Structure formats: C-alpha cells, structure tokens
Amino acid sequence: MEQNIYFDNGSTSWPKAPGVAASMTKLLESGAFNINRGNYEGAYELENQVLKTRMQLARFFHAPDSRCVVFTPGITYSLNCLLKGFLKPGDHVLVSSLEHNAVMRPLCQLASQDIHYTMIPAETDGTTHPESLEALIRPETKAVIMLHASNVCGTILPIREIGEICRRRHLFFAVDTAQSAGSVDIDMQKCNIDFLAFTGHKGLLGPQGVGGRVGKKGQRGPRAVPPQGIGGFLISEALDQELTPLIAGGTGSQSDSLLMPDYLPDKYESGTLNLPGIIGLHAALTYLDETGISAIHQKKMALTGHFLEKIREIPQAHVVGRQTLQDRLAVVSLDFPDYDNVEIAFALEQDYGIMTRVGLHCAPMAHQTLHTMPQGTIRFAFSHFNTVEEIDQCIAGFRELFSV
C-alpha cells in the first residue's frame, strides 16, 4: 500500500493548521481555567483570548460587532437552534434542493408543529437560479435557509443575489457555510445574511467540536433568534428584546437573577464553553490571516483543476456536478455507474492508501437532485496541504483498478 493520502477534507480538515495542537496542549497543561467565573489573572488572560477569537471571526465574516459571535458545539447545533428557536406553527421556509440533513431533519421534525418548507429546485449540476425563488414565496414565508456550497458536488450557490431578494421581500436569510468558510471570502453584510452558521473544523482548519452562527444587526428578520454559536448573530435592539433563549443556565454574569442576561453574547451562552476548541480555532484563524484565504483557495482550485483534467482519462468515472472550475469549491464527486462505488472507495483505501468519503454524505435530497440516488458518490475534497503528486498517485490507482 502507498503512503496514506487524505482527500476527505469535506468531512473534516487534516492536517490542521500549524499551531492548533500546540495552542490547545499549552492551555490544557498550563491553565485550562474557566472564563466569567474565576477572579484571577489566568482566567482574565483566557477571557481576553476568547474575545480576540470573537473579533477574528467578526472580521472574517465582515460582521460589524464581535459581541454577536456566539459559540456552540458545532454547525448542526447552530442550525437546530435557528430552526427550533425561530420558527413557529404556521410558518413556512424556503430551502435549496441540495441541503444537508442538518437542515432537513430538523425541518421534518418541525412538520408536526405545522411548520413547512418548499425546496428551491437546482439543476442536475447543482446550479440554483435566484429568480426561481420568488415564485415560491408565500404570505407565511419567514425565511430562506440554504447552504453556501454543496457538500456533495461543490457547486456554489448565488447567496449574494438571493440575499438581495430576501432583503427586498423582508425575509430572514440564513446561510450554512460548512463547506465554504475558509475557502472563499464571505461578507454577511454585502450578502444581506441575517444568520451565518459555520464550523471551525473544516475550511477554517481548527479542531472538531466547535462551530457557530452569525446574524446581522439592524435588518428585518426573525421574530426570534436561536441561541448558541461559534460565529454568531447580529440583530437590532428591538428584535433582540423579543428573543427567548432555548438554553438557559449559568453564564457567570448577573448571577443574582434567575433570568438569563439580556445582552450579547451572554444571553445565548449558558454553561461552560469549549475553551480548548476556541483557543485552537484562534490559532487556525491566525494561520489563515497570515497565509491568506485567496492564496489557499487558489492552491485548492489548482489541485481541483488538475484532478478534473486527469479524471477524464478514466472513462468509467463520471464527474457529478459542474465539469469546470466555475462557481465551485475544491469538492468533486465521482460516480461509477457500472460499478459499486463503495467497493471502489474501499479498494482506493486498502490498495493505495487514498482516503475519501463514499455514500450519500448526509444529503439525500442533493443526491436526488444530482441523480445519484441511491448509490451515492465517492467524494474527493482537497486541502491546500495536498499536492499534485498525490492526485497523480490517485489517478494511477484508478488506471490500475480499471486497467486503463
């Protein structure tokens, strides 16, 4: 077997950014204190590091205020907070036909509460047309909720155009940036994003177990905004007064009151935060700032272009989604119509050390849209730490498997 090659960065990035492991180890070994509780220097220093991470994230997503960054265990948690803390009986939302189960399963749970959704249809390459959205808006429609880029085929959705429609139609706009954060610049103000959910362990190159959301301040949106997040939400003062956190508990602030604090971020951060994860994310964001997202994206897309060019030499392979680099990320799904995708993925790992993800990728609606149900696809998601040589080894493995 060849040396292991990791092409599963769509699930989680590896390796992590330099400095992530060291920063977390240092915290755990030299003073893993708690913030907003301890009245001693070590706790104050750690609180300052958490504040710096909030400021990094606010700059990263072009949010105007770091107080709107709220930490959660992950992006699935954040999206559940949005859906279950905002929507009320009789409400209706629009979602793309490429959504992850982090959105679809909560919505299906909410159907018993008379909360409904309509899918905005995408083409078979993942292309979504903003103009198709307006015809689906109903009087009871409260929000548009969609991923920024498909975790199956990598197609980027036109969130700026859709955000403008939401602004004009006074709809709440929520964006899942699980695949795009850290790969492309995301400006929540220019895109009119009211709620931006993100994860720290994929394109942001941080540790697992941290994620969050960003909501926009001063925009018309939900009657209630859900709690928790790494990332956060920004919202007008009037709207903020209507919020009721789903999670309540100790915050280390206003402890004389049995009610939750009414100010950000404390209002939505009950309990002990994942401080090692936040410190690791701080190190990852520092690396991204120093390296530059543009440079990272350019390297990843160069690798993707090389893969798309070389895979054409394997006639058994069908590229699912866009065939070029336009409007896509460094995520490529392959289908082998005459073969078992699971067996091919297994052979790649066992015989050539190539690690991918095979199956439905927790996005069955996307596979229905892309016509890859029920077999799913083999997904290749590249990092800027990957190399052209690794891709060439992968193509050589395919040639050997199919005797091309």
Identify the function of each model-found stretch:
Residues 1-404:
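Pyridoxal 5′-phosphate
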